[in-house]
């Protein structure tokens, strides 16, 4: 079973909320990565694991002909409204429904870690990229520099994953993305880090935003709403800044590779 069967129902429960809250928090990563791929005017572009399509919309604004794939049809409905000319399809990142060499630029933001087999997912990104094209992967950075990982860790303690399940931020470990790209036959060019603070005006806003994400929905399904809300409130209160803001500072990173 591919990732779509598992992830699609989880991520599709609050698509409008996701698109206006946490997806917007990720936008610094999207914009930095798109900038690193070079000019997009007149190019074909795919975002695999596109969610509600913010990165695709940003690519379209730079002149690209955009496509997107995601496990969640409700999220794709938002993406289609944002970019009516785009080609957005539901499916598995491990089995992309596009022909070999279809795109000049292929990205995947915080998507590879949800694949049943990340190596297969990255091989698919490489397959649909044309020779001479670019593949870029964006992920959470060093967990020790991501305050939101403290929240993730507490939530995982409520509903531990089955034995043998890959660590959710395993692809964030040093060199992992680069190795996946290299094994897919791509030439790694480099990358960079991007500051991605996640800030909310109050705890209610934080709760609404965080529970639009698939992993939070899975934990709620397992243990119920009250324990999850208690964890979110406790962690965010502990991270409250001296100015009173509910802000978690994070570092994300991207890696860019070329297809020979």
Predicted ranges, named:
Residues 34, 57-60, 119-126:
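A structural alpha-helix within SAM-dependent methyltransferase catalytic domains
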